[in-house]
């Protein structure tokens, strides 16, 4: 059981939460990115640099994730693939994707893509709030607690 991070788009404040959790719970955290990511020295934290390109990091995460692993990502198609493989997916705002919610999220994403393609401005997500950070930390702790149960 380990945590994979879609690190190119993951906010630094969320990475910091993950770094602390990795050491506190002795859980392996791997940040996958197409650029160099600075991480604190720890035997529980590592980086995996992939080549640049569309979905290269996502594809590497899907290739390596195993049932029971957790993936941190805001990428809904990646989260869907992780869930399909028996993993768990959590976004940086603390929303845990489930088999039931991921289908709805994929449909909404496709709808918004269609709207943007037709020229309608849809705007982006709001800035990460303190509440979002707390929600993320809470959901991460829940997952870690469940994963460590014998």
Swiss-Prot record:
Family matches, as CDD domains: PIN_YqxD-like
Family the entry assigns: Belongs to the UPF0178 family.
NCBIfam families: PRK00124.1
Official protein name in the record: UPF0178 protein PC1_0756
Organism: Pectobacterium carotovorum subsp. carotovorum (strain PC1)
